[in-house]
């Protein structure tokens, strides 16, 4: 995960060690950083509220909220160190943290994943979300980009519009670490059936998980990027299980999780 400088949970400020701190202490911690990244941690999506700020930013803390250059964050937010992507990701677009969207799900006795997408910034923006103007491409399990990039409006690009990098066949170095990391993380929390992970690779080659989204995740991104369904050849089996689960009383469904029907 990116290194936390300050976070706020239920209006309570904490440092990187999860110790409760005062408003003065929080401002002191931020004053030591040349730049940092701020984002809400609850009920947020599509890069909304994500802000990159510098040391001279106007910051005020008050009653479980923070004002940053006029942007208001309440109750739940995090302030993190900046991440620098590895060379192969930076070469495509250097101004954003380009991230992999990997949707994992538990099916019977293993962690499976839907088709993988790489989200990429453009136009000088430092966020890569499709709803914020970014583009996305299909990527295979070896870290190779499969085809052209698209926008959410199905505008297609054979090359990145800013850097000119050709997409199809481009290989992302050390991608295997990302896939292994999110799989291992999901194994640690089997109570959650499906997780939308946002992850990247830093300049030192480490897999970095930025977010684990456990609700409101959509399958439109991998479907649009790859042109295939999210469950592939497993789709018939999944639909049969869903039909079966509709007949089971809610309080009895725990016995039939992850594709089990008997």
Place the predicted regions along the sequence by residue.
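Active-site nucleotide/adenylate-binding loops and adjacent lid/helix of ATP-dependent enzymes
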Residues: 1-100
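Short secondary-structure transition/capping segments
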Residues: 45-56, 122-133, 157-164, 239-250
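A short, terminal or domain-edge coil/loop segment
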Residues: 54-66, 128-144, 246-262
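A long amphipathic alpha-helix within ATP-dependent nucleotide-binding catalytic cores
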Residues: 73-74, 81-94, 107, 112-115, ...
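C-terminal active-site "lid" helix and adjoining low-complexity regulatory extension at the edge
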Residues: 156-183, 187-192, 201-262
């Amino acid at each position: 995960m990116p290194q936390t400088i300050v976070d706020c949970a239920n209006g309570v400020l904490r440092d990187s060690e999860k110790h409760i701190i005062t408003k003065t202490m929080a401002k002191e911690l931020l004053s030591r950083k040349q730049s940092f990244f701020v984002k809400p941690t609850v009920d947020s999506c599509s890069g909304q509220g994500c802000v990159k700020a510098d040391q001279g930013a106007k910051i005020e803390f008050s009653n479980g909220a923070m004002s940053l250059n006029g942007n208001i964050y309440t109750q739940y937010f995090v302030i993190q160190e900046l991440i620098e992507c590895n060379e192969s990701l930076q070469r495509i677009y250097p101004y954003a943290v380009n991230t992999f969207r990997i949707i994992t799900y538990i099916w019977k006795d293993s962690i499976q994943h839907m088709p993988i997408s790489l989200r990429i910034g453009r136009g000088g923006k430092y966020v890569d979300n499709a709803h914020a103007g970014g583009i996305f491409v299909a990527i295979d399990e070896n870290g190779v980009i499969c085809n052209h990039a698209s926008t959410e409006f199905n505008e297609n690009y054979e090359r990145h519009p800013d850097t000119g990098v050709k997409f199809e066949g481009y290989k992302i170095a050390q991608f295997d670490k990302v896939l292994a990391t999110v799989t291992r993380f999901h194994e640690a929390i089997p109570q959650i059936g499906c997780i939308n992970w946002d992850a990247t690779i830093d300049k030192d080659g480490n897999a970095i998980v930025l977010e684990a989204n456990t609700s409101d995740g959509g399958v439109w991104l991998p479907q649009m990027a790859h042109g295939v369904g999210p469950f592939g050849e497993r789709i018939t089996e999944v639909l049969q299980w869903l039909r079966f689960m509709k007949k089971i009383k809610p309080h009895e469904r725990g016995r039939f999780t992850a594709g089990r029907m008997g």
